[in-house]
């Protein structure tokens, strides 16, 4: 949930920089907290991946729910623009 604190920089800076002719290559990895075996509480188990996908137009957002989706990291590395990878172990 600390990604919400970075929303100004993500939406108003990182997402807009390509419109001004500069395309930084940034890869951000964040994780959604699990509810089992220990509940991290409502503040750390919320998933904002869909909100990021809606608000960010030049930044790719990938949601990874299983270990088999490790290709998301390769895509982020090969993708020319910035990427946010949201690890959501509870799907």
PLM features: residue spans?
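Conserved thiamine diphosphate
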Residues: 1-91
């Amino acid at each position: 949930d600390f990604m919400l604190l970075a929303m100004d920089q993500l939406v108003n800076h990182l997402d807009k920089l390509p419109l001004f002719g500069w395309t930084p290559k940034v890869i951000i990895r964040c994780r959604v907290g699990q509810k089992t075996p220990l509940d991290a509480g409502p503040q750390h188990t919320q998933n904002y991946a869909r909100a990021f996908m809606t608000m960010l137009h030049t930044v790719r957002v990938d949601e990874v729910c299983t270990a088999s989706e490790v290709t998301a990291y390769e895509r982020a590395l090969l993708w020319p623009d910035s990427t946010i990878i949201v690890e959501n172990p509870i799907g």
